[in-house]
């Protein structure tokens, strides 16, 4: 699994990778089909509830995306203790990935400013997903891994739509929150469009890595 660090964002890298955004991993077996169906079901729920409220959709995406790394890291940690075996660095890798997604979430919370009711709904959804993903991971690590890859593909679609709405002026642009500027080392004059661009680039790279 690739860990994307908070490095200086490169506009040239962004445009260089735009042609890769429409990549899709075709399911090759039953496990892949289960992962894709599960992902599409969750996408349907998000589409129904949030529609074109892309800031809120991003909050939901990152809330869910922050779970797999933490769940897998915890289970791998327990396995390492139980079998008294070295994890070969995977626990830290998975927890770093969870932290990266958490910072994405914190960024979009500053942008979307979800209400108390929306926060409660998100909390319930996260609790259900944590249990569900843990069960899936224990039953089939391959399926769990593929789910994360398809999540990243769906995130690419959502961020692309979000960026298109911002660039067309349908959604007003705004200054980037300080937390995003500090985390990704963005220029001080950066805007929401720059934040979405960097998230789109990183998510696209993650989707490509996870769906190999």
Task: Explain the meaning of each model-derived region.
Residues 9, 202-207:
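Conserved small/polar residues in nucleotide/adenosyl-binding loops
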Residues 14-204, 212:
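Iron-associated oxidoreductase/ferritin-like identity signal
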């Amino acid at each position: 699994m690739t860990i994307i660090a908070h490095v200086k964002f490169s506009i040239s890298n962004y445009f260089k990778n735009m042609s890769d955004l429409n990549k899709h991993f075709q399911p090759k077996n039953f496990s892949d089909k289960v992962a894709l169906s599960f992902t599409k079901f969750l996408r349907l729920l998000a589409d129904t509830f949030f529609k074109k409220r892309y800031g809120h959709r991003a909050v939901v995406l990152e809330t869910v995306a922050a779970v797999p790394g933490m769940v897998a890291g915890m289970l791998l940690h327990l396995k390492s203790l139980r079998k008294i075996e070295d994890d070969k660095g995977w626990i830290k890798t998975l927890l770093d990935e969870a932290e990266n997604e958490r910072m994405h979430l914190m960024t979009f919370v500053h942008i979307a400013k979800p209400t108390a009711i929306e926060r409660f709904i998100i909390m319930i959804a996260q609790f259900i997903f944590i249990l569900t993903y843990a069960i899936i991971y224990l039953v089939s690590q391959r399926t769990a891994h593929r789910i994360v890859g398809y999540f990243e593909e769906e995130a690419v679609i959502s961020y692309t739509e979000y960026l298109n709405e911002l660039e067309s002026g349908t959604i007003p642009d705004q200054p980037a929150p300080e937390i995003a500027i500090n985390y990704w080392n963005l220029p001080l004059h950066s805007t929401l469009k720059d934040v979405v661009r960097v998230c789109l680039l990183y998510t696209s790279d993650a989707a490509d890595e996870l769906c190999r």
